[in-house]
Swiss-Prot record:
This is UPF0449 protein C19orf25. Pfam families: UPF0449 (PF15136). The keyword Protease does not apply. It comes from Homo sapiens. InterPro entries: UPF0449. Belongs to the UPF0449 family. Residues 81-109 form a coiled coil. Keywords: Coiled coil, Phosphoprotein. It comes from the Eukaryota. The modification Phosphotyrosine is found at Y63.
Amino acid sequence: MGSKAKKRVLLPTRPAPPTVEQILEDVRGAPAEDPVFTILAPEDPPVPFRMMEDAEAPGEQLYQQSRAYVAANQRLQQAGNVLRQRCELLQRAGEDLEREVAQMKQAALPAAEAASSG
């Protein structure tokens, strides 16, 4: 009977995490249009509600709050759509990667069998 114990696969050691200085250097070197900076940047920042209370009548205040809410809701919907699209891209890339790994394994298997029997 064959052994039921699985062979343990030795993984390479992980690289050390980046230092704070390296992270800051990367962030400073990133262009302003990098998605890290643009994905959540508000187009029209809402007026703080405390300022509106002092300056405007209650009806106008509610109107401005409603406008700020609608604008924030639109930004959230747009961000959700962007995230959905990027998620789909990542899923497709993952599927492609899995297919390519399977193809490489199939291509490597006959070569490994030939080497072990030869």
